[in-house]
Amino acid sequence: QPLTESVARELAVREGLKAVIAGEITEAGGSYVLTARVVSAADGIELASHRETARDQTEIIPAIDRLSGKIREKIGESFTSLRSDAPLAAVTTSSLEALELYSEALEAVDHRGDAEAAIRLLEEALEIDPEFASAWRKLGIELRNARRERARATHAVTRAYELKDRLTPRERYLAEAAYYMDVQFDEARAMTAYERMLDLDPNDDWALNNLGIVYGNLGDQERALDLYRRSVAVDSSSITLGNIMFTLIRMGRFEEATEAIEAGYRLFPKDRRFYVGEMDVAMNLEDYEGVVTIATKMQDALPSDMPAQAVSRFHLAENADLQGRLAEATAIEEEASRYLQQMGLPGGDYAWGEFWRTLDVRRDTASARELLERMLVEHPLEDIEEPLDRPSLGFEAMFGALGDAEAAQGMIDAFREAVPDTPDDRWADDQAAADGMAAIHAGRFDDAIDHFMELRRLEPGCNTCGFYEIALAHDLAGRADSAIAWYRKDLETPRLNAPDRPLLFERLAQLYDGQGDLEDAALYYARFVELWADADAELQPRVTVARARLEEIIRERG
């Protein structure tokens, strides 16, 4: 079939071309009139035209040559007023408008880090074309990355998978990989899909980045970093540069991470992830004033970005917690939670941080239990319509930490019953953690260690998962050497947060002291006393004890 002007214009818009040339030949009394027009692809406005006449069929070819020459001249004049557009995304949809919205969504998330805008644009695209598989896939990914509405995210990724047979090979592999990763929790099959994408194009930046994520989840950070860097070399996006940054932080390569952060600020100044990375580096380096400076800078730079406002405050709350300023941490966390509530995020009503600071830092088990029970009465999980959006597993961890194994298991069982189609792999790590905490509270310390080692096997990409609990089990079993080794492993492993740092300082000091290792005891007493120098009054008795023992050791050692 002949290529019509309207179809040619749509193809040009998809490919980022400025204009198309439309032409026709009309017979008039034995002669022929040849007309060519240069038309803007974006809006159909005629930019230039020319006409030539051929007296008979023998003159048609020479007339075409003359017409071509004149049009070339006029194209040169007209194109100075045209702007060049980037090609639209090469994905399957019947709607040019939906494709434009999808392409805008990619720009929002890849170069501005604006997931909220991307989600809105993708929703608009899907209203226009409900069978737009790539938009469904991307919507699911962004909802997951933003930790929003797991039920919607799962539905979106599943819908993309259901539409995969109408897609190009590249799109089909992307839809399959997302489904295997986010719905089936089958990383091996996701890896295969991304590798097939690389068979199609070894420089596919999306495949390289996403395969890096899989390797990172499997604990192979070096391989992940290599893939991210190959992806950035093809096409720099804030997502992949952010993945490089966070991987370097997890690897403890803070100077290189800082270089990635500086590049992120330069290339993507509105992307919140680089502020987060800079705060994580400062926290790892124990630069607590730096965390405050960066969080304040983030709030000032991104005043209308509600996720940025919430995230900055959660970091400030953790920073206050680390220094024993629990009342300040609670107040800041309440501010952060209000942003979550404004965004409509499930779980924004629950005082997660207050529970853990009450139980772990204040060591007030009764008040922690009272708080937990009050949360569930004031905000019943059943009030959250979608079972998959209910934070049941967060409550499982709380009940487990309190030693209520029955309630912890009940949370897992209720969640599994509410979402029966979820693969067993989704629950394996939570079950291992629940079994481990139950064993600790039952005094079965070796069983607890086995369960938390299983957790580490199930979560190889988590730097520190299970470290504290394994150390605690050894500690309660009276195995000081093993407890010290695991507490130090927990303390010294690079991470993206460090809520236990003061507790580790305090307990390591006590363990070394008990072994007669006064040099290391003094070191950790000093670090603890310094960190909690301005702690709340309710914590100062512990600081006083540690300071007194530190001074005693110094006197003993001369």
Where are these regions (language model features)?
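Register position in tetratricopeptide repeats
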Residues: 110-111, 145-146, 182-183, 217, ...
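TPR/TPR-like (Sel1-like) alpha-helical repeat modules
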Residues: 144, 149-150, 154-165, 488, ...
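TPR/TPR-like alpha-solenoid repeats
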Residues: 142, 179, 214, 247, ...
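Acidic, proline/glycine-rich low-complexity intrinsically disordered segments
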Residues: 1-274, 278-281, 285-296, 304, ...
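Solenoid-like repeat scaffolds
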Residues: 161-166, 195-200, 232-235, 262-270, ...
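Short coil/turn linking the two alpha-helices of tandem helical-hairpin repeats
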Residues: 106-113, 140-149, 180-185, 219, ...
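Start-of-helix register in tetratricopeptide repeats
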Residues: 99-100, 134, 171-172, 206, ...
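Canonical tetratricopeptide repeat
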Residues: 138, 210, 243-244, 277, ...
